[in-house]
Design a protein with these regions (language model features):
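Catalytic alpha/beta core domains of metabolic enzymes, predominantly
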Residues: 1-114
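C-terminal alpha-helical cap/extension of soluble enzyme domains
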Residues: 59-60, 69-174
């Protein structure tokens, strides 16, 4: 289900406590509408083209609310800063690096029988960002079903991060 821009406008006018709207549709109808949304903070919840969607790049969103934000917080912050500094090409290049990693990780886990592909891909990437070089010496993420994601997934994703020069020198936990 997707709320219309008109519905969001009506809700924003009626309820002053309604201050944030997250669009996960990927269609971006609300953000692209020309309606007065009464100052609602718009965040995008769909992956991809990170450098194109923020207001400082001419896009309609104030920020992101993504699962990958936990993995790529530093990079998303850098994209925003690059855009603020007029470095659109550098922001686009970093965005593309992240997109390639995320897309390949989604494909990697697609047929895994436990969990869902989106959550599994993010768990793998977060595991690597948490432990850095130690990621292969730690147990892989444990899913709610009690199944661990395969270490081969961690190895593959670590290779992707290295290839894109996004592998952390030090994990945020280690």
């Amino acid at each position: 289900n997707e709320l219309t821009a008109e519905t969001i406008q009506t809700l924003a006018a009626r309820f002053p406590g309604f201050y944030l709207f997250k669009d996960t549709s990927g269609n971006d109808h609300v953000a692209r509408s020309s309606l007065d949304l009464h100052g609602i903070f718009l965040v995008r919840g769909a992956e991809g083209d990170y450098h194109r969607w923020l207001t400082n790049a001419g896009g309609p969103y104030n920020g992101f609310l993504l699962s990958s934000s936990n993995v790529f917080a530093e990079q998303l912050t850098a994209i925003r800063s690059m855009l603020d500094e007029g470095q659109a090409r550098a922001a686009a290049a970093l965005s593309e690096q992240m997109e390639r990693v995320i897309e390949k990780c989604f494909k990697l886990v697609k047929g895994f029988p436990a969990g869902n592909a989106f959550a599994n891909a993010i768990k793998i990437l977060d595991h690597i960002m948490a432990f850095g070089e130690e990621c292969l010496h730690r147990d892989p993420p444990l899913l709610y079903s009690g199944v661990r994601l395969p270490v081969e997934f961690i190895e593959y994703a670590a290779g992707l991060l290295r290839q894109e020069e996004l592998f952390p020198a030090r994990g945020y936990i280690s």
